[in-house]
UniProtKB/Swiss-Prot annotation:
This is Small ribosomal subunit protein bS18. One of its GO terms (molecular function) is small ribosomal subunit rRNA binding. Signal peptide: none annotated. Pfam families: Ribosomal_S18 (PF01084). Part of the 30S ribosomal subunit. Forms a tight heterodimer with protein bS6. Binds as a heterodimer with protein bS6 to the central domain of the 16S rRNA, where it helps stabilize the platform of the 30S subunit. The keyword Acetylation does not apply. Residues 1-21 are annotated as: Disordered. Keywords: Ribonucleoprotein, Ribosomal protein, RNA-binding, rRNA-binding. Belongs to the bacterial ribosomal protein bS18 family. NCBIfam families: S18. Residues 1-18 have a biased composition (Basic residues). GO terms for biological process: translation.
Length: 96
């Protein structure tokens, strides 16, 4: 008799288990720029841009920050401009 559908050869579920407790306490994400009434993001505002860059230097995705798509596109463009003008580093690790 074949194993039940959705499970592997030995009856184990292939999908990783999620922590159900963390799902209960998840805070609702909101767009910071919409709440404050910002119409355009400035590439010279480095303090704001740093909040949306991860520790490894990557731009944090909108699904984690809650930023609307309109502002996420502006944000990524501004971060890239600030990096090009040396206002922000490309990565966090610089070998000296």
């Amino acid at each position: 008799m074949p194993p039940p559908r959705g499970k592997g050869r030995f009856g184990k579920d292939k999908r990783p288990k999620r922590n159900t407790q963390s799902l209960l306490f998840r805070r609702k994400r909101f767009c910071r720029f919409t709440v404050t009434g910002v119409t355009e993001i400035d590439y010279k505002d480095v303090d704001t841009l740093r909040d949306f860059i991860a520790e490894n230097g990557k731009i944090t995705p909108a699904r984690l920050t809650g930023t609307r798509a309109f502002f996420q596109r502006q944000l990524s463009t501004c971060i890239k401009r600030a990096r090009f003008l040396a206002l922000l580093p490309y990565s966090d690790q610089h070998k000296s």
